[in-house]
A protein has these predicted regions:
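Solvent-exposed alpha-helices and their adjacent loops that cap or buttress functional pockets
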Residues: 94-96, 191, 241
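Repeat-unit-sized solenoid/scaffold elements
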Residues: 56-64, 188-214, 269-297
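Catalytic alpha/beta core domains of metabolic enzymes, predominantly
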Residues: 215-241, 246-308
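Long, compositionally biased, glycine/small-hydrophobic-enriched stretches that function as flexible linkers
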Residues: 1-99
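Charged, glycine/proline-rich intrinsically disordered loops and linkers
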Residues: 24-68, 209-231, 290-308
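Active-site beta->alpha loop and helix N-cap motifs at the rims of alpha/beta catalytic domains
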Residues: 68-83, 98, 103-234
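A generic structural signal for ordered alpha-helices
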Residues: 90-93, 107, 221, 242-243
Length: 308
């Protein structure tokens, strides 16, 4: 089987773009694409986005960086190559080894180093940054890192271009949306627009008025999940939509039920983090209570089940 590449078309390069096109000469094309190119195209070049990606990430001068899919764009008599963000791709537009992409949930730079070439996404939130790393002397060796920005800047240096970084807003209930945008902009500057993903929690019954109840000893809300206004129910959904309109990709997280996930998709997130294991554990616990009651007919078992 004959392999056709952009390099085999012998197209002239757009003047001044030789260093860019050197990276894509090995890009494979179909025989139909090759025929169309030979008969209709005079030059080969790259898009402005392609240039921005290469400028952002210093990589081998003969390669395109991981985390991007190569696409052909026709512009008059010029065939341009674009780099589209897609973490299922390794360097040079090659697919990763499997369809399963791995994500790490960590804010420990020392922990991230050995896995940096195996993951395609990293998630972290303020709690992980401070509780599990900065304020943990066993993890934050020599108290080297003092605040969240220092940690995230170091993580950005460690991870390559092929890894998205999902970082959670410090206060998703901030009433001033411009303040939220300022925080998102700061992370975009740290990670680049190509890697940053803003993590938004599914709030549901949790609001700015009762969120502090989750920090108390029993970590329970004083009202049940049905006691919530329609506006509060869809607060985080609308926050996702607003951030998306502002140009950010969203990691919508903290769903515990399948039906929540289906509705969350209407907010057009880039990622969904759904904790179905929690529902599995609860279902198995309920099933166990029922089995014990069937065997013992002990009424206290039913009382414990209701409390659960």
């Amino acid at each position: 089987m004959i392999k056709y590449t952009l390099g085999s078309t012998s197209l002239a390069t757009v003047r001044g773009q030789e260093d860019y096109t050197q990276r894509i000469k090995n890009m494979e094309i179909s025989i139909d694409e090759w025929s169309q190119i030979k008969n209709n195209i005079d030059y080969i070049g790259v898009t402005e986005n392609f240039k921005d990606v290469i400028t952002t990430f210093s990589t081998d001068p003969n390669q395109t960086p991981a985390g991007f899919r190569r696409e052909l764009v026709l512009d008059g008599n010029v065939l341009k190559v674009d780099l589209v963000r897609d973490i299922s791709y390794d360097s040079d537009g090659e697919l990763r080894p499997t369809n399963v992409l791995f994500s790490a949930d960590s804010a420990n730079p020392y922990e991230i180093v050995p896995m940096k070439n195996l993951i395609s996404n990293l998630t972290c939130n303020p709690g992980i940054v401070y509780d599990l790393f900065i304020n943990n002397p066993e993890a934050n060796i020599g108290n080297q890192f003092k605040d969240r920005d220092e940690v995230m800047t170091e993580i950005a240096k460690i991870l390559g271009p092929g890894v998205d970084i999902s970082v959670e807003l410090n206060n998703p209930f901030e009433k001033n949306f411009d303040t939220i945008l300022e925080e998102a902009e700061k992370f975009k500057n740290m990670f680049s627009k190509h890697r940053v993903v803003i993590k938004v929690p599914h709030t549901g019954v949790v609001t700015s008025e009762n969120v502090n109840e989750l920090m108390l000893e029993d970590k329970k809300l004083s009202r049940d999940f049905k006691n919530v206004s329609t506006e509060d129910s869809f607060y985080s959904h609308n926050l996702c939509l607003k951030l998306r309109e502002a140009g950010y990709r969203i990691n919508y997280t903290l769903m515990f039920e399948p039906y929540q996930t289906n509705l969350a998709l209407q907010a057009k997130p880039y990622f969904i983090n759904t904790f179905l294991r929690q529902r599995l554990v609860q279902s198995e616990t309920i099933q166990n209570y029922v089995k014990i009651y069937d065997l013992t007919k002990d009424i206290t078992i039913l009382k414990n089940l209701r409390q659960y």
